[in-house]
Amino acid sequence: NLAVTLANMGCKVGVLDADIYGPSIPTMFDMEGARPMSVQVNGKSKMEPIENYGVKVLSIGFFTKPDQAVVWRGPMAAKALNQMIFDAAWGELDFLLIDLPPGTGDIHLSIVQSLPLTGAVVISTPQNVALADAKKGIAMFQQDSINVPVLGIVENMSYFSPAELPDNKYYIFGKKGAEYLAKDKEVPFLGGLPLVQSIREAADVGRPAVLQDQSSLAAHFD
């Protein structure tokens, strides 16, 4: 949704799905079954990212079957990631958004060593088990040897409001956990997104909720 919003604002946007072991971006962009083509750039063969909704996308999911498990050691995963970064014809971009897997590990280290990152946005649900991973992620980015600015924290699935009781909020996963974490770590709290069925359905069918006028998510990007 963030990528599509930036594209709609006139920005040149790319999305790199760095979740090597569980790629979901092809589904969310309605690109399942797509395969990148090879193009020549300055005499060299490059992968051409697949574009939809004005956003260029690359994912390991383009090269595997939907039911195929990616069982790779860290060095092989890092090599595949570097190929999608450096052996791809991204062209000129204003933003390259990188979807990282939860936690910390080889993938995260490869990214921070390969690219000069402008910043990181940490996403977490409010419950403690999720916040524990988010806290470790923040600590990783703030290490002196990595030193990537944490632009803020977003709380996903903050609360649930049933259609018949739109003014009621039910904090199924806990209340304001990510907001408290942001205060504790002295990083900005960027806001919370509610648990909304239409948002989940939009992701499953590859139609970003921000493009749907009736979506409650669209209002967050106005």
Map each language-model feature to its residues.
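Phosphate-binding/switch loop-helix module in NTP-utilizing enzymes
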Residues: 61-111
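Amphipathic alpha-helical transducer elements in NTP-driven molecular machines
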Residues: 22, 74-82, 128-135, 172-175, ...
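Loop/turn-to-beta-strand initiation segments
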Residues: 53-56, 91-96, 119
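Residue-level signature of catalytic and energy-coupling elements of molecular machines
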Residues: 17, 25, 58, 81, ...
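C-terminal boundary of histidine-terminating zinc-finger modules
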Residues: 203-215
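Gly/Ala-rich phosphate-binding loop of Rossmann-like dinucleotide-binding domains
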Residues: 3, 7, 112
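Phosphate-binding loop that captures ATP/GTP phosphates
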Residues: 6, 11-67
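Conserved catalytic-core segment of NTP-binding enzymes
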Residues: 94-95, 101-201
